[in-house]
Amino acid sequence: MAQHTVYFPDAFLTQMREAMPSTLSFDDFLAACQRPLRRSIRVNTLKTSVADFLQLTAPYGWTLTPIPWCEEGFWIERDNEDALPLGSTAEHLSGLFYIQEASSMLPVAALFADGNAPQRVMDVAAAPGSKTTQIAARMNNEGAILANEFSASRVKVLHANISRCGISNVALTHFDGRVFGAAVPEMFDAILLDAPCSGEGVVRKDPDALKNWSPESNQEIAATQRELIDSAFHALRPGGTLVYSTCTLNREENEAVCLWLKETYHDAVEFLPLGDLFPGANKALTEDGFLHVFPQIYDCEGFFVARLRKTQAIPVLPAPKYKVGNFPFSPVKDREAGQIRQAAASVGLNWDENLRLWQRDKELWLFPVGIEALIGKVRFSRLGIKLAETHNKGYRWQHEAVIALASPDNVNAFELTPQEAEEWYRGRDVYPQAAPVADDVLVTFQHQPIGLAKRIGSRLKNSYPRELVRDGKLFTGNA
């Protein structure tokens, strides 16, 4: 693999020499940083099994190497990477996998270690969505996830990834993560804080990542991280699990933040060692049981992961002064909900008791039941999935609901050819050789729902959202 030139400030190298355990080679560290990062993917088990995915992609000649800490994660090598971007493959477009760096799969693995099965989870800094979608898959779309993102511009990307992966149990918020301890005290069974950091571990992906690095900025970032972990710890219920992670390497933003929390709340904080998380985890284990992953250990990004338990309640914070505002939705009455459920089932859309129908004007939404306790405490950017819009002739079913709820075995399902599927993703109407019988057609490819179409004569009218339409070369190789 080709080398690339990484910029290292002298003070950074001095700091790394001090931080690195004596069992590791500093020369190996420098050499690893100069190698481009291996690409990796995570199979979306909400859509397919690992075995079925491997069988589906076997003809492509992809070399898939298992990632030790994530059963559904693989490093990937492809001969035609330049000819067809991974994000333009049919399997990516239909949500069968997520392009995710191997190290970033560690925090969710830690969150669900030892059979942990939380029902209400918060992802404090969620965009672009790799960990939120991984959490949703581990929860099998059950329970509820609050996915927060402070950056307004990244909330849209977060929602797009959640929708593509067919996730229904997520509520999105757009807040500074420091508000949650006061706003929703002791409300979550598990919390992931993948904290904003100095990014020292990502130089293999971005050789200029350290251009603006300084010891002073590390200290400023660490101060924010302490405030974030304090807030998250308050939002965690007693007995709950908190995972703190960063993609940086210095101790100030990693071990020191966790030790500060322990010094602040004493016996209420219990560190849960991660040495048994996966075979070979001990190579990155610190004396406190954290994983401090230098890039040469597993040939991946630099990363840090800590897992802790809140053993007892702590004093609550003053209530926040902001006003949430009126909640513009109302629950749908049982009789009407039954009629809506029946109409949805006729086009292949079904859901279980984890989701409940709500209405806003002519919009119908499905909210995860587990998030209802937070209504009135925080303001949501988006809640659950939009099911339909009502009109005089019935319902206009929404694309995100089709991707999350549709069964490819429904009677109205119609399998497209590769060329027809590519036309669909380009936003064009499809003219199949043998037209389907149903008027509302569940369009599938590779036995995966990819949209809902109206049959007009021999034509399938495209309903693929304009913002998702793809140009350029796609999976058949045609531009």
UniProtKB/Swiss-Prot annotation:
UniProtKB keywords: Cytoplasm, Methyltransferase, RNA-binding, rRNA processing, S-adenosyl-L-methionine, Transferase
A GO biological process held by the record: rRNA base methylation
Compartments (UniProt record): Cytoplasm
Residues given in the record as S-adenosyl-L-methionine binding sites: A125, A126, A127, P128, G129, S130, K131, E149, D176, D194
Reaction(s) this enzyme catalyzes, per UniProt: cytidine(1407) in 16S rRNA + S-adenosyl-L-methionine = 5-methylcytidine(1407) in 16S rRNA + S-adenosyl-L-homocysteine + H(+)
PROSITE patterns: NOL1_NOP2_SUN, SAM_MT_RSMB_NOP
GO MF annotation: an example: rRNA (cytosine-C5-)-methyltransferase activity
EC class name: transferase
Name of this protein: Ribosomal RNA small subunit methyltransferase F
